[in-house]
UniProtKB/Swiss-Prot annotation:
One of its GO terms (biological process) is mitochondrial electron transport, ubiquinol to cytochrome c. Component of the ubiquinol-cytochrome c reductase complex (complex III or cytochrome b-c1 complex) that is part of the mitochondrial respiratory chain. The b-c1 complex mediates electron transfer from ubiquinol to cytochrome c. Contributes to the generation of a proton gradient across the mitochondrial membrane that is then used for ATP synthesis. Its cofactor is heme b. GO terms for cellular component: mitochondrial inner membrane; respiratory chain complex III. The cytochrome bc1 complex contains 11 subunits: 3 respiratory subunits (MT-CYB, CYC1 and UQCRFS1), 2 core proteins (UQCRC1 and UQCRC2) and 6 low-molecular weight proteins (UQCRH/QCR6, UQCRB/QCR7, UQCRQ/QCR8, UQCR10/QCR9, UQCR11/QCR10 and a cleavage product of UQCRFS1). This cytochrome bc1 complex then forms a dimer. This is Cytochrome b. It is found in: Mitochondrion inner membrane. It is a multi-pass membrane protein. Keywords: Electron transport, Heme, Iron, Membrane, Metal-binding, Mitochondrion, Mitochondrion inner membrane, Respiratory chain, Transmembrane, Transmembrane helix, Transport, Ubiquinone. The chain crosses the membrane at residues 34-54, 78-99, 114-134, 179-199, 227-247, 289-309, 321-341, 348-368. Heme b b566 binds at H98, H197. It comes from Thalassarche impavida. The lineage of its organism: Eukaryota, Metazoa, Chordata, Craniata, Vertebrata. Disulfide bonds: none annotated. CDD domains: cytochrome_b_C, Cytochrome_b_N.
Length: 380
């Protein structure tokens, strides 16, 4: 009998082992759909971004006009732009849910997969930040100024580092040019990191909602999970297209409809919604360096998750106290997101400070403590 090409061809064999004949736990829920949704988000963003880059001019005098031209004169340019801008929001919704699922079900115990995942998150955040600067509106310009300026808080080399990043003494043409170059490069880095992420994942295989070994009950990825993923794609593209067609500016900032003006500061500088939780933590500390360290810690704290896992059970499925703590953390993140969008005045300042303390306390103190308590209650 002739060998099956899918199983013998050097390239097809890799695809087959990752997407077709991959043994998959039979009980993984819809929470396991977000990995493939992130993949489809990345592909959509690269495609729409490539089409937008063909009509974009990375120059301070022309950037804003070139985007207006894309939306008005290019065939379906408005749609491509709206899909790209709102696609970023969906990318972050998916990645936050993906991380939440990993945290809830103890997937961070696959250390390499978890760590590459955090690197992916950081790269995605960098990509979204430099991308937000490209339209060269008011919020683009001032957002870039405020956030890049934070590097000046680094002792001794800070100021030099900022001027080196800017390519001058303020955010100007060189900054825009290099940000465009970075925004083009980083998604391909994300694609490369994704392959590493998947390689590490397939070393151990997927986790499952029970957090137990599933070798005794595996099913092939295709057709079961390919079909399930296609359903996921449909359920994501529906709200994305609805948002892009009916309310494309809902998640943006009205300030960005005004071309960048270095002489006029917007009344309230704030990033896109997906950075607001970190922005709230940054603002809650009255010291510049302290704020920057807290901002970095808000994401880098995820690296500690495997070390802080004290429970004898992997998932939170059968741990009601830890579940309560998890949902408290989720609520706390919503509060931080809301605070980040508010002006710096009473009572928002104190709420932000309390929410920031709570965020780190839950992750670093309460989770390990409650896990140890649950072990004791279960006589482990």
């Amino acid at each position: 009998m002739a060998p099956n090409l899918r199983k013998s061809h050097p390239l097809l064999k890799m695809i087959n082992n990752s997407l077709i004949d991959l043994p998959t736990p039979s009980n993984i829920s819809a929470w396991w759909n977000f990995g493939s949704l992130l993949g489809i988000c990345l592909m959509t963003q690269i495609l729409t971004g490539l089409l937008l880059a063909m009509h974009y001019t990375a120059d301070t005098t022309l950037a804003f006009s070139s985007i207006a031209h894309t939306c008005r004169n290019v065939q379906y340019g408005w749609l491509i732009r709206n899909l790209h801008a709102n696609g970023a929001s969906f990318f972050f919704i998916c990645i936050y849910l993906h991380i939440g699922r990993g945290f809830y079900y103890g997937s961070y115990l696959n250390k390499e997969t978890w760590n590459t995942g955090i690197l992916l998150l950081l790269t995605l955040m960098a990509t979204a930040f430099v991308g937000y600067v490209l339209p060269w509106g008011q919020m683009s310009f001032w957002g870039a100024t405020v956030i890049t300026n934070l590097f000046s808080a680094i002792p001794y080399i800070g100021q030099t580092l900022v001027e080196w990043a800017w390519g001058g003494f303020s955010v100007d043409n060189p900054t825009l040019t290099r940000f465009f170059a970075l925004h083009f490069l980083l998604p391909f880095m994300i694609a490369g990191l994704t392959l590493i992420h998947l390689t590490f994942l397939h070393e151990s295989g997927s986790n499952n909602p029970l957090g137990i070994l599933s070798n005794c009950d595996k099913i092939p990825f295709h057709p079961y999970f390919t079909l399930k993923d296609i359903l996921g794609f449909t359920l994501m593209f529906l709200p994305l297209t609805a948002l892009a067609l009916f309310s494309p500016t809902l998640l943006g900032d009205p300030e960005n409809f005004t071309p960048a003006n270095p002489l006029v500061t917007p009344p309230h500088i704030k990033p896109e919604w997906y950075f607001l939780f970190a922005y709230a933590i940054l603002r809650s500390i009255p010291n510049k360096l302290g704020g920057v360290l807290a901002l970095a810690a808000s994401v880098l704290v995820l690296f500690l998750s495997p070390l802080l896992h004290k429970s004898k059970q992997r998932t939170l499925t059968f741990r009601p106290l830890s579940q309560l703590l998890f949902w408290l953390l989720v609520t706390n993140l919503f509060i931080l997101t809301w605070i980040g969008s508010q002006p710096v005045e009473h009572p928002f300042i104190i709420i932000g400070q309390l929410a920031s303390i709570t965020y780190f306390t839950i992750l670093l103190v309460l989770f390990p403590t409650i896990a140890a308590l649950e072990n004791k209650m279960l006589n482990y």
